[in-house]
Swiss-Prot record:
Keyword Thylakoid attached: no
GO annotation, cellular component aspect: HslUV protease complex
UniProt record, GO biological process: protein unfolding; proteolysis involved in protein catabolic process
Record function comment: ATPase subunit of a proteasome-like degradation complex; this subunit has chaperone activity. The binding of ATP and its subsequent hydrolysis by HslU are essential for unfolding of protein substrates subsequently hydrolyzed by HslV. HslU recognizes the N-terminal part of its protein substrates and unfolds these before they are guided to HslV for hydrolysis.
SUPFAM superfamilies: P-loop containing nucleoside triphosphate hydrolases
InterPro entries, per database record: AAA+_ATPase, ATP-dep_Clp_protease_ClpX, ATPase_AAA_core, Clp_ATPase_C, HslU, P-loop_NTPase
Assembly information from the UniProt record: A double ring-shaped homohexamer of HslV is capped on each side by a ring-shaped HslU homohexamer. The assembly of the HslU/HslV complex is dependent on binding of ATP.
GO molecular function terms attached to this record: ATP binding; ATP hydrolysis activity; peptidase activity; proteasome-activating activity
Keywords: ATP-binding, Chaperone, Cytoplasm, Nucleotide-binding
Name the record gives this protein: ATP-dependent protease ATPase subunit HslU
Compartments it resides in: Cytoplasm
Gene: hslU
């Protein structure tokens, strides 16, 4: 299922969306390629090759999450992002770390199901067309009548005609489930019962809709009939085991420092609970057992207060690749505004175009935006590229509000307009830190 790229191609693809941070891009590109290399090996050796998990160190807003998320999208791999602070040691109130793997399996099932749906889309569309014709002319109509209506249907002449269709009532089969504390996967029995009763009942509901709007629910319905659910689950478990990527953010927040308070006990407990996951263990899910041996773990943190060496030595050893991401410079911020395929400026221009307003942002305006972002990051708090969104929203506030009334006009943003719009924000910067 995973798409194969060479490390150079992976870095090149990441460059389209993320500025700078070449060391981090190289590390994740090599890790991705090593997965493909492992799958080319024979059985015994393949089992021995473990993924080289990565620890990204760098301030907020420099691209840590963006790199991991783009990597997963690029590879077509199941990806889950979690914050380390959301989890608690087993025995405390809160989520336990095994839920990370269960979430990964759910995402893998969604990915595999979408892939399988695409494979049966043509067949499902043909079946859906037959059901629309049944609703239009009845099942007993002559072949000539059906063909006549089929031609009209394909030409779009019947799009607005109202019909009644019968589709599966998926909601009727859903049963609320819960995990029993200390018994991961204990909801399996409940799920199996709901599936049994669902198959026995096979309930449907009648919907009144237009011919045009009927196709989507009918295609979904027919796709489900053509899919083998057991095969989807088995493939999803395999994909999650071999291609899954888990991104653990804010891992520095659970690093314990010498002389810490009692809360450090729970933080250290979370680290100890993470150890078997990262090293390789078997987790029970409602779909079956899943091994975590070959899942790629990418941990990240700013490490402003703590240091990577404050993590448990065992956990440090399971994150062998260390990458430091650099703080963003003025030039980086300027490039972020313009170079990525979906840069902020391109986004705002596209949004205004939906209102028939032509937005132009000059080069000196881009320089001014970058300068202001750097200044605010230095004077308040360094939140990296996220500061650009704050600045852009303030600058374009007026045009965003009045755009519906100015269809067919052009609007030019230059350095003078930027400074005029942002003046009060920059002036109040010293006061803003005292506002709760």
């Amino acid at each position: 299922m995973c798409v194969v790229f060479s490390p150079r191609e992976t870095v090149s693809e990441l460059d389209r969306f993320i500025i700078g941070q070449s060391d981090a891009k190289r590390s994740v590109a090599i890790a991705l390629r090593n997965r493909w290399r492992r799958q080319q090996l024979d059985g015994p050796m393949r089992d021995e090759v473990m993924p080289k998990n990565i620890l990204m160190i760098g301030p907020t807003g420099v691209g840590k999450t963006g790199i991991a998320r783009r990597l997963a999208k690029l590879a077509g791999a199941p990806f889950v992002k979690v914050e380390a602070t959301k989890f608690t040691e087993v025995g405390y109130v809160g989520r336990d770390v095994e839920q990370i793997i269960r979430d990964l399996v759910e995402i893998a099932i969604s990915l595999v199901r979408e892939k399988k749906r695409d494979e049966v889309k043509v067949k499902a569309h043909i079946n859906a067309e037959e059901r629309v014709l049944d609703a239009l002319v009845g099942k007993t109509a002559s072949p000539a009548t059906r063909e006549s209506f089929r031609k009209k249907l394909r030409d779009g002449e019947l799009d607005e005609k109202e019909i009644e269709i019968e589709v599966s009532d998926n909601n009727s089969n859903s049963t609320s489930t819960f995990d029993i504390p200390g018994m991961p996967g204990a909801q399996m029995g409940i799920m199996n019962l709901s599936e049994i009763f669902g198959k026995m009942g096979n309930r449907t509901k009648v919907r009144k809709t237009t011919v045009k709007d009927a196709f989507k629910p009918l295609i979904d319905d027919e796709s489900e009939k053509l899919l083998d659910q057991d095969q989807i689950i088995q493939e999803a478990l395999r994909v999650a085991e071999n291609d899954g990527i888990v991104f653990i953010d804010e891992i520095d927040k659970i690093a314990t420092r010498d002389g810490g308070a009692s809360a450090a006990v729970s933080r250290e407990g979370v680290q100890r609970d993470l150890l078997p996951l990262v090293e390789g263990t078997t987790i029970a899910t409602k779909y079956g057992q899943i091994k975590t041996d070959h899942i790629l773990f990418i941990a990240s943190g700013a490490f402003h207060v703590s240091k990577p060496s404050d993590l448990l030595p065992e956990l440090q050893g399971r994150l062998p690749i260390r990458v430091e991401l650099n703080p963003l410079t003025r030039e980086d911020l300027r490039r972020i505004l313009t170079e990525p395929e979906a840069s902020l400026i391109k986004q705002y221009i596209a949004l205004m175009a939906t209102e028939e307003v032509h937005l132009e942002i000059t080069d000196d305006a881009i320089d001014a935006l970058a300068d202001i972002a750097v200044d605010l990051n230095a004077r308040i708090e360094n939140i990296g590229a996220r500061r650009l969104q704050t600045v852009m929203e303030r600058v374009l506030d007026e045009i965003s509000f009045t755009a519906p009334d100015k269809a067919g006009t052009s609007f030019k943003v230059d350095a003078a307009y930027v400074k005029k719009s942002i003046g009060d924000l920059a002036a109040d910067v010293d006061l803003s830190r005292f506002i709760l």
